[in-house]
């Protein structure tokens, strides 16, 4: 962005209302260039943002934010919105530590009406905001902008049903429509679409409804008959359009890159006093030929070379890739294995499986709850379903994990990708809750691999079990093999790495924290403090006697975990040791018994964590290698211990 560019002069959405259409075209070109430059450098969501520039400008030309609220579904297509609402000077910090979020964030701007990150939530949120405005005597309009992909989520249709029933003036803009929504048919339907938003038609409709409704005794009944007749007529020309069936007016399709047309339709839509769906067709990746040709490759992308679109090469394999390879290897030997994803085939590493075993691959769409119950159904029919799902999206299916899977003790395997801190995407995408959510669930087993070989061993072991099993792993490079962790899997037992016979400090960790712990252990050794490492392998169940036997020779135990501290495995293990020490010495000498061991837990504290690199998030959360070193040294030198009141005696399921 240059000093004298149009974009540099846009301080807020009101400024774009002063521009001519020629200036708007120039502004769109500048915005495309800025998005391409910043995403090329920082990484981010490219194709979707390049496709909604004109739509975003048109929305802000017609409506007045923040008086009128715009809710962006998922939110990854909000870059233009951010730039024209006073954040263009900081746009270069997009997705960087302490920089702009890649998603709408109320804490960032009054123009961000609602925080989003997960799909299919916008219509529900927008409807709630609209009702809140009405109750507060606020006349502002509310617009939900949702992509056709997010329309595969059931929550979107729940909200449409509710909105149609309430008959409030909610505006839903569907971007693209390449899924399953039928196009209108014939010239008359196009006329009807134009007529629906014409001001004269709307005034006539209002006066007619009012006049008919005022007829004594039969007015309301007549209105009801006319309303049903109108819906029936629309159904003929809209081929059973689902939005009409929900009680919405329906407008479109509209060219999403023609700002004159967009503004004209939006101005008419703004005057409606009933819910309306406006279908806008856009080109994903618009203006960047490589993204137009292959929008999927440029949906979410790391830093790349703009000239050829190539991402910086990294020879290391990721945990996602390691999982994909291991699953294909297992499926080649076992025809019962099926793979399920919730619209994240590539992101979860299932593309190779899909190409090799298309009849055993299932994409449930953005419907995590359905995906889990579908997998449970497969398991009940004798299959071995593996549901690959991001940790952050697993949260959306907890009821199905408990009700449909675990109560029946069905052998569904959950491959939980992006467990632990997730770089760049912020609070809505952190994978910090899965252990705390799944540990209390009866019949559930949770494993945490630290390497490619260990992941393969765990998957092979899981496929031989008859209960629900979760295998959680981070969004990170995956070590090929850690020799100590290549031994066979024993239920509830981890692996001890002894660095010295004289070690008095033990550091326990989940697989995703092993590299940080290993680095910390090396630093401590250099400082003359020897530590041993215990890779827990299992977050559940825990072989308590085995674990207590491992820890009995250590005076200082530090528990490290890539999840929330509240409800953590580490807190459970700490309570197990404290309970054991208390019982060992007897209730009369409880305090003396606890002094035999000093313990501490390093995990993510009770807050939401922002975007940044994994190392920046580790440091910000106080669980980096440096913090582990400090905690171990403090534990070794302090004279006090954790009080008994902090330990919750929990019985392992």
Curated annotation (Swiss-Prot):
Positions binding thiamine diphosphate in this chain are: 76, 117-119, 149-150, 177, 288, 368
Tell me the keywords, alphabetical order. Isoprene biosynthesis, Magnesium, Metal-binding, Thiamine biosynthesis, Thiamine pyrophosphate, Transferase
Top EC class for this record: transferase
Q: Which GO terms describe its molecular function?
A: 1-deoxy-D-xylulose-5-phosphate synthase activity; magnesium ion binding; thiamine pyrophosphate binding
GO biological process terms on file: 1-deoxy-D-xylulose 5-phosphate biosynthetic process; isopentenyl diphosphate biosynthetic process, methylerythritol 4-phosphate pathway; terpenoid biosynthetic process; thiamine biosynthetic process
Task: Relay the cofactor remark from the entry.
Answer: Binds 1 Mg(2+) ion per subunit.
User: Pathway of this protein?
Assistant: Metabolic intermediate biosynthesis; 1-deoxy-D-xylulose 5-phosphate biosynthesis; 1-deoxy-D-xylulose 5-phosphate from D-glyceraldehyde 3-phosphate and pyruvate: step 1/1
Q: Does the keyword Transmembrane apply?
A: no
The Gene Ontology CC terms held by the record are:
cytosol
Q: Which reaction does it catalyse?
A: D-glyceraldehyde 3-phosphate + pyruvate + H(+) = 1-deoxy-D-xylulose 5-phosphate + CO2
Q: What is its EC number?
A: 2.2.1.7
One Pfam match, given by its short name, reads: Transket_pyr
Cofactor(s) for this protein? Mg(2+); thiamine diphosphate
At which positions is Mg(2+) bound? 148, 177
What does the annotation say about its assembly with partners?
Homodimer.
NCBIfam families, alphabetized: dxs (TIGR00204), PRK05444.2-2 (NF003933)
Family stated for the protein in its record: Belongs to the transketolase family. DXPS subfamily.
The record's function comment reads: Catalyzes the acyloin condensation reaction between C atoms 2 and 3 of pyruvate and glyceraldehyde 3-phosphate to yield 1-deoxy-D-xylulose-5-phosphate (DXP).
HAMAP family of this UniProt entry?
Answer: DXP_synth
| Stated name of the protein | 1-deoxy-D-xylulose-5-phosphate synthase
The organism is: Treponema denticola (strain ATCC 35405 / DSM 14222 / CIP 103919 / JCM 8153 / KCTC 15104)
State the taxonomy lineage: Bacteria, Pseudomonadati, Spirochaetota, Spirochaetia, Spirochaetales
